């Protein structure tokens, strides 16, 4: 990383308007409750449009019919996307049945969307149904607090069903970190759960009265799997085990992928190592990292407000020293660890606890009854008989976890009956991913989720033609440069530029530790496929044994590696 660290600890200047909004929100209340009772519009007005994000929702509309409604002098068809807080992605079959029923009866699209942040989203909830959605989550033992905006978002944890004891310990820490960093305001309970207002003054001892400068993402990672893509996250705890038991964490900070087209002051960044800590220091270090970013993060320019820019401004050594001072903990040298991959192991695996775990490939994470593929009904049928739990993965798949040997056949029979298991799915498709994008995401510049399935079919044909049809390239599509599809950690990454046009990035690796460089800018699908055809042909003919596509692209000089993204990402 860059060694040019000479910036101020605190950026002075006129604060971004989001800071005013938070300051005036009365600890995230705003006038959301009043807006809920306004039947003249299906949306939220003014500051509430942004404040609801702290409560786990985004106001969206169906962009496919936006122009048509405008011609009819109608407002956009406003509906909310609601995202659950589900640290580690673990939920019970009973919780699944509850959300399945709600999605079918109370959303415009009838689907459950598993996200690459290990939770689920409802798309298309009308304003009149929002309170019942939050109350349903509460009844199920869930909530949507702090799954969006300037807070610590849903905490990820490696979906490792084989190392059952280690996973259990890591998962417990993911939950504890999530709970420790939650907002303390009672606004969520008052507005959505109709709990009484209390006279006590709100305080936010960790997040502060204006919360964080920007969104903040955290992971707990169990090597050698990097399924959570730690380098896309602000704060990461890499599990270090001794004889199968968790003893501590290597802490890495400052990863992030969001950029803005045309703004070279924005760039992706991999996370930097702070050092090793024993498990008993985990919450103290987590809090210290968050409060340091709270106080030092840029509140004048939201495009430069994330932790990665704070590190580039003040330097990793200065940041580390401040975290140590606040936590009263001194980092030890980083313990050895390595990553070998980040894909999910689709199909059955047996854990050391003798339980079986079935990972189901869910293309794009969209659980819906498709013609001939009634996935949503199938998941509900499995939930009715499953005695273990469900684990949502950061690759948008679902694990039916903790299956006893005697129950394995009945679970598999249902999975096959409802097309949740398909032996014909290629390795390439399993290693391809897209964000939601159009028609619901207001930031989308190009298609992603709707684009990916057929695009992968074209890539599969190219792979077969070059004799590598049984192999895979980590392929990701994100509909805009905000990076939700994590394309800037892929071997082939497409970043939406306009309808039908993408920037093509090459040179990431399978382990997710290298940022790909832009190879072609603003090109069409046909142009992308021509480029991929030529490049896969070279890879198939010239690669070294076991050399991944991204590694080949670097070695062959097709693209130069991104070594210091603050300086060379745009070179």
Swiss-Prot record:
Binding site residues for [4Fe-4S] cluster: 435, 441, 480, 484
Tree of life domain: Bacteria
Stated name of the protein: Sulfite reductase [NADPH] hemoprotein beta-component
Pfam family, one: NIR_SIR_ferr
Gene Ontology terms: cellular component: sulfite reductase complex (NADPH)
Source organism of this protein record: Musicola paradisiaca (strain Ech703)
Binding partners and assembly: Alpha(8)-beta(8). The alpha component is a flavoprotein, the beta component is a hemoprotein.
PANTHER family membership: SULFITE REDUCTASE [NADPH] SUBUNIT BETA (PTHR11493:SF47), SULFITE REDUCTASE [NADPH] SUBUNIT BETA-RELATED (PTHR11493)
Cofactor or coenzyme needed: siroheme; [4Fe-4S] cluster
Family recorded in the similarity comment: Belongs to the nitrite and sulfite reductase 4Fe-4S domain family.
InterPro entries named among the record's database cross-references: CysI, NiRdtase/SiRdtase_haem-b_fer, Nit/Sulf_reduc_fer-like_dom_sf, NO2/SO3_Rdtase_4Fe4S_dom, NO2/SO3_Rdtase_4Fe4S_prot, NO2/SO3_Rdtase_4Fe4S_sf, NO2/SO3_Rdtase_FeS/sirohaem_BS
Cystine pairs: none
Protein EC: 1.8.1.2
Cofactor note: Binds 1 siroheme per subunit.
Binding site for siroheme: 484
Function: Component of the sulfite reductase complex that catalyzes the 6-electron reduction of sulfite to sulfide. This is one of several activities required for the biosynthesis of L-cysteine from sulfate.
GO MF terms held by the record: 4 iron, 4 sulfur cluster binding; heme binding; metal ion binding; NADP binding; sulfite reductase (ferredoxin) activity; sulfite reductase (NADPH) activity
Encoding gene (name): cysI
């Amino acid at each position: 990383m860059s060694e040019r660290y000479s910036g101020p600890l605190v950026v002075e200047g006129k604060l971004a308007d989001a800071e005013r909004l938070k300051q005036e929100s009365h600890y995230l209340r705003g006038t959301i409750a009043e807006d809920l009772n306004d039947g003249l519009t299906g949306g939220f007005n003014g500051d509430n449009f942004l404040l609801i994000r702290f409560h786990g929702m985004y106001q969206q509309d169906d962009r496919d019919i936006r122009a048509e409604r405008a011609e009819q002098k109608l407002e956009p068809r406003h509906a909310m996307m609601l995202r659950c807080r589900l640290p580690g992605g673990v939920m019970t079959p009973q919780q699944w049945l509850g959300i399945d029923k709600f999605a079918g009866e109370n959303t415009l699209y009838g689907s459950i969307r598993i996200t690459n942040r290990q939770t689920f989203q409802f798309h298309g909830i009308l304003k009149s149904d929002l309170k019942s959605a939050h109350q349903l989550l509460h009844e199920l033992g869930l909530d949507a607090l702090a799954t969006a905006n300037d807070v610590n978002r849903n905490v990820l944890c490696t979906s490792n069903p084989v190392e059952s004891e280690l996973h259990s310990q890591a998962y417990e820490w993911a939950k504890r970190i999530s709970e420790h960093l939650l907002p303390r305001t009672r606004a969520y309970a008052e507005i959505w759960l109709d709990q009484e207002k209390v006279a006590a003054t709100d305080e936010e001892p960790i997040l502060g009265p204006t919360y964080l400068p920007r969104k903040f993402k955290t992971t707990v990672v169990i090597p050698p799997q990097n399924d959570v893509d730690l380098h896309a996250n602000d704060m990461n705890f890499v599990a270090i085990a001794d004889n199968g038991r968790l003893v501590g964490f290597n802490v890495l900070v400052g990863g992030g992928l969001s950029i803005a087209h045309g703004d070279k002051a924005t760039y992706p960044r991999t996370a930097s190592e702070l050092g090793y800590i024993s498990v008993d220091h985990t919450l103290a270090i987590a809090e210290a990292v968050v409060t340091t970013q709270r106080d030092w993060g840029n509140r004048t320019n939201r495009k430069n407000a994330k932790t990665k820019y704070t590190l580039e401004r003040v330097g990793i050594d200065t940041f580390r020293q401040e975290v140590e001072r606040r936590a009263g903990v001194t980092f030890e040298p980083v313990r050895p660890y390595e990553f070998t991959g980040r894909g999910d192991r689709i199909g059955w695996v047996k854990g050391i606890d003798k339980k079986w775990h079935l990972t189901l490939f869910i293309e794009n994470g969209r659980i819906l009854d498709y013609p001939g593929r009634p996935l949503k009904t199938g998941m509900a049928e499995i939930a009715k008989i499953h005695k273990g739990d469900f684990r949502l993965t950061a690759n948008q798949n679902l694990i039916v976890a903790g299956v006893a040997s005697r129950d394995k056949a009945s679970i598999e029979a249902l999975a096959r009956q409802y097309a949740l298991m398909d032996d014909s799915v290629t390795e390439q498709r399993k290693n391809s991913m897209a964000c939601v994008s159009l028609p619901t995401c207001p930031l989308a510049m190009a298609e992603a989720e709707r684009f990916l399935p057929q695009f992968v079919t074209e890539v599969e044909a190219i792979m077969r033609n070059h004799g590598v049809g049984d192999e895979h390239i980590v392929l990701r599509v994100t509909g805009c440069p905000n990076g939700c599809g994590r394309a800037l950690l892929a071997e082939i990454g497409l970043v939406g530029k306009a309808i039908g046009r993408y920037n093509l990035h090459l040179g990431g690796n399978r382990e997710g530790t290298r940022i790909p460089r832009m190879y072609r800018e603003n090109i069409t699908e046909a142009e992308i496929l021509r480029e991929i055809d030529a490049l896969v042909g070279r890879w198939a003919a010239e690669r070294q044994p076991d050399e991944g596509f991204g590694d080949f692209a670097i070695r062959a000089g097709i693209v130069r590696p991104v070594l210091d993204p603050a300086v060379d990402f745009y070179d």
